[in-house]
């Protein structure tokens, strides 16, 4: 009987200990989320949820487009991910650059499709999208080059690269702007070890097979580009793979470009069609088209 009594207390202690660990885990997660989201972000997220809570049954592309449209009029803010000296997950719903606009719209859409949009789910989705293998492990783990972002998010099953099927042609990206001009990047200044790691990534990008649709052929592909497709504009600038990113939207059967343009402007939809918009940029070479996949 005494042995049974001791066993009971041992089991009871272990259960209490396990419950305490679980409780502390959730408390810690709550604290970390609170640090990531400021009060303004929380207000924006609650408003977004209220306006989009009945979209889970819709096609993922349509939900991405709706998420993007929610941010029309939001201020462009540069370097939103370069806060502090250490790499951490940044959520900024009130100021976006072109990349964070695209990533945030995709992350919100995936969370909606999963039927669980809250602060922690958004953090999880952004981490999965923004970092190599979905793991935040320092500055180099962030997918800085869009071409690298494409490869990794295709591998993770988050998007499909449909560029080739839309008439895309082979392109080689000699991406090296980060290693050649580290002084332009706050976290790379005077850090040769980090620059060497970036070089390794750049060399990998050069070896991969990529496709893009040249500017002259975009109009022919527009009908097959869907609402919510992610658009990456390839570059003629030496060392740069992609100039700009955004989201395709449809109006009256035509395709337009929704994006966060240069500093001083706001998230908007192009007045001209996608092909006309891209051809208007002297340094634009073509586009890659990435199709969001159902989570």
Regions from the PLM with identified roles:
Residues 210-221, 235:
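Short alpha-helix capping/helix-loop boundary micro-motifs
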